[in-house]
Amino acid sequence: MRLKAIGLGAVALASMAPSLCSPLWAQSASPAKLAIENPVSEEALRQHINILASDEFEGRGPGTAGETKTIGYIAQQWANAGLKGGLADGGWYDPVNLIESHAAGGSLRFINKGKAVKLPEDSIIIRSRDAAVHLKKLPVVYAGFGVDANGKVVADVAGKLALIRMDDPAFGDVKDLRSRRDAVAKAGAAAVFYIVGGEKAPWDIYKRVYGETTTIPSRQSAAAVDGIIRRDAAQALFAANKVDWDKMIAETVKPEFTGIAFTSKADLDATTHIRTIKSHNVVGKIPGKLGADKGVIMFLGHWDHLGICRPEGAADRICNGAVDNASGIAVLIEAAKRLAKNQPDRDIYFLATTAEEMGLLGAYAFADKPVVPLDKIVAAFNIDTIAVVPKGEKVAILGRGTTTLDADIDAITRSLGREPETGLDSNVMVNRQDGWALKARGVPALMVSGSFADMKKLMAYLEGDYHQPEDQPGDKIILSGAAEDADLHVAIGKHFGSVTAWPGT
């Protein structure tokens, strides 16, 4: 995955022409700064943000009236810019069915030698894939992290309730928690429970976050039942089975660990309220001269936010999401206007995703059923939370060092009179944004922005107005840097849209 950046190679440093397939760079005695034709203005971005993040749009929650207004606005703006609907039938709206689950009740009893194991009160959270599940006399196994350093399931879990640690293992290139859970479930476990404790998140947060989830079919748990058991309850279960907790936790990291079977059996009941939320991605397209055989490029950003996020009686109930991510959608609209003026060599797709705030779900849904084969996407650029810093900031590549695109992006950055931020600090957020859903499938996907060049400034936003009602339209939103980044994305689109500037090899 860590590919070295390559040089510009065939990038022609010739005179700039209006056609997108013409070489990008202008000949000059001082070629460091490229003249920007029709630069994006702060006011243009502000107008879109003021609409998308207005109270009328109710925080842009998926499946709400706010969604209907939001996706209609985006599609209309792209159509006005000259884009075509990006679906195979020419449509704009790609359905995404979100599965909302609410743990409505349940019980988990461990029986050891005919006696119930006494557990602390309110120490277990249970959820099921189906509305109701009843399982009796399940064998119980502690399976450590679930898998070993090679990703192989360590214990015999078939037909059993498997307990695995939630914390990340310190060995090997082990997959994430979801992957570990699903590996155990696919090995035949009837139920999978995480052991939690000692983490920063208090129990009430676990109950809220884990007990109420939204996903898509491909991201559902492979386990019929899964849940969380608090560490003090797990310790009581270990003790009832005469297993030394500290010793067994230490054994977990050893290569030879193969789990331990308990003498206890488990009786489990779970009730889950399930409903489907009908949502949509929006897909637009600038048709290229050469078609998909020469590859396509993509710009994406999420349109959704948190909707009505405060209870009745609160002074402000709406999380408007002005910076996150009305600002990104505003940039997508303005970039589309400029890129559509001249036909590129390659198709350029614009994707506005739903349910990013629920776990990148719209992006994952697109990756599951893409409108263009993923291996045809030669470059994808996600735009998110782009109105954080003023103009003049360095340009960070979130995902630097993971694709062959870096050198060209750095050259484009310098051509606009800006400096690349070559550090890797921003890469800590690679898997927290929509581009990750594509990157995980092999697509060269990046974020390019000044907003991620100074992590202190970004954290000031994340620790302040982020996901709060205060993230709303107003003069305090910094748009000078966003306008600069919008111009940068136009230049990126022209460059990678050209098979002369970017052959794609």
Kindly give the residue locations of the regions a language model identified.
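Second-shell loop/turn segments in exported
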Residues: P31-P39, D55-A65, R127, A131, ...
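Extracellular/luminal Protease-associated
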Residues: L119-V225, P287, R317-N320, G423-L424
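Catalytic-core environment of secreted peptidases
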Residues: N38-F57, P62-G85, L161-M166, F171-K175, ...
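C-terminal segment of classical bacterial N-terminal signal peptides
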Residues: A14-L24
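His/Asp/Glu-rich mid-to-C-terminal helical/loop segments that flank catalytic regions of hydrolases
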Residues: K337, K341, R346, K457-T505
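Noncatalytic luminal/extracellular "stalk/propeptide" segments of secretory-pathway proteins
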Residues: E58-L161, D168, S279
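Soluble metallo-hydrolase cores and metallopeptidase-like ectodomains found primarily
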Residues: S30-K33, K113, L119-K152, R219-G321, ...
